Amino acid sequence: MQAKYSFPEKNAFRAREALDTDFDIDVHDPKLYINLDDIRILSEETDYKDSLYFMLNIDPDTQNLDTTAQDYSKILFLGHRGCGKTTEIRRIHQYLNNPNRYFAILIETEKELEVSKMQAEDFFITMVIKIIRQLKNAGLSGATDSFDDLLKEWLNDTEVQKEITNTAGVEGNASVKADTDGNILMKALSIFKFEAEIKGTLARESKTTTTIRSKIKSNLLDFITKFNNALAEVKEICASNNKGRDLLFIIDGTEKSTFEFYEEVFQKNGHILRSLNVNLVTTLRLDAFYKLEGKPNLDFYESVFVPMITVNDSNKDVLAQIVTKRIDANSFFEPEALAYLVEMSGGSIRQLLRLANQTLLFSRGKKVGLKHATNTVKKEGEKLYHALSPDQKELLKNKKWVDNWSHPDASMMLYAMALLKYNGNAKINPLIQSYF
């Protein structure tokens, strides 16, 4: 049973939960959202949303999709862990998923897949299943038939068909198509399209999983052709039913994937994404981006960076609201203690929440003073510093990371947040600044 919260929370235990870095504000209360654009975007050059919308052919004056362009945008949405990418990308999806813009499909991979086990082919399987299910939810179930040729190829194996139908307990399932007439392929097709739990299906090394992955890998051209044919049909159906002028996939949550996964999808198989006749925005780990930058197939992506927030006196109160909207500040924080945590967050939402959460732990729920806040910052800084290798410490000491982000140590320090990148510049995380 989901806990009931009363924001700003006054119960110490629920307050700590609300300050957890994985606490989903959109699930618990969207009103907890803080619009940070005014303090994040410092110039036209750093207005990442306007840049993204223009790349996607959204007319700045009408705010509608201009359909005169014939190309398909493939955009990398980049930023530090905890800078607010997921929160912002959900709102970007809400804006773009509009009859005058796009039929936009949001895929949050952490919800849909076991990200740490995700393989390159799973990326494409999930795209197919998610657009099918969103079409059904939009009242366009008939449009999902456009994908049947592709899915029949995937499921054209008796063992796969039996595995899918047995897993679903098909005999007693009324939602399976009534006109299957004992055709196990059609039963399996219907279940796979509308009912199969994606995370469970792809997490297991089942016959279904290995067969579909193998078919995509061994015949990429066939997959691309059939997927593109289906997308072309669906695009016309969406437009004629006033559901969107074009199609757009937005993919988030791959940060726990291995570097090898990124290399496989975005570089080695980058030509597949390039060949798909659909617009795509996807997040990418910052360190992976710099490691892959300049390699074949990376040059056709456009990039949008969500900049870190530079903390200063004019925006500290706004950043503090990330905490004070969730918990009652008067119950848990002396003003100077919270102000200190904001300053030491480096403008990272994730780091601010982590510091506030840990400080509340160390105080055992009592009101936090500056001493508790200082001790928390010291402990968190020690952990980050001791996790660095000698070579990484040397890079930080001599500032050798500048203009050398492809270096494995430099790029990994971005991922670990030992280095924080602000609008093109990078600084050492304030938690460990005193060591250097």
Where are these regions (language model features)?
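Walker A/P-loop-proximal flanking segment of P-loop NTPase domains
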Residues: 1-98
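P-loop NTPase nucleotide-binding core
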Residues: 73-74, 79-242
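C-terminal alpha-helical "lid" subdomain
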Residues: 330-344, 349-436
